[in-house]
Amino acid sequence: MTIDLKTIKHISKLSRISVDDAKANKLAGDLNSIFDFIEKLNELNTDNIEPLTSVAETTLKLRADEVKSENIRDQILKNSPEENEDFFVVPRVVE
């Protein structure tokens, strides 16, 4: 895939970014280098390679989920400077 100035101008118009000709030439060269590298990666045979999900082979210890039926509403409301009918009362910020 080759990126030319016409494509750069089209992309810049779609993205609403102004690009002058000097920057467009440099950008076209940079994008062509990136696409050339991607093409080299596509040539690699990865059929017998297992997908890598993590560099380090680690597993996390999982804990068992426990359902707790504690009613901590009163403990939480104790931390509030002001409460009314089981709700926090906060100062008005918008008039």
Swiss-Prot record:
One of its GO terms (biological process) is translation. One of its GO terms (molecular function) is ATP binding. The keyword RNA-binding does not apply. Keywords: ATP-binding, Ligase, Nucleotide-binding, Protein biosynthesis. It comes from the Bacteria. Its EC number is 6.3.5.-. InterPro entries: Asp/Glu-ADT_sf_sub_c, GatC. It is an enzyme of class 6 (ligase). It catalyses: L-glutamyl-tRNA(Gln) + L-glutamine + ATP + H2O = L-glutaminyl-tRNA(Gln) + L-glutamate + ADP + phosphate + H(+); L-aspartyl-tRNA(Asn) + L-glutamine + ATP + H2O = L-asparaginyl-tRNA(Asn) + L-glutamate + ADP + phosphate + 2 H(+). Signal peptide: none annotated. The keyword Ligase applies. PANTHER family: GLUTAMYL-TRNA(GLN) AMIDOTRANSFERASE SUBUNIT C, MITOCHONDRIAL. Allows the formation of correctly charged Asn-tRNA(Asn) or Gln-tRNA(Gln) through the transamidation of misacylated Asp-tRNA(Asn) or Glu-tRNA(Gln) in organisms which lack either or both of asparaginyl-tRNA or glutaminyl-tRNA synthetases. The reaction takes place in the presence of glutamine and ATP through an activated phospho-Asp-tRNA(Asn) or phospho-Glu-tRNA(Gln). Belongs to the GatC family. HAMAP family: GatC. Heterotrimer of A, B and C subunits. This is Aspartyl/glutamyl-tRNA(Asn/Gln) amidotransferase subunit C. It comes from Pelagibacter ubique (strain HTCC1062). The gene is gatC.
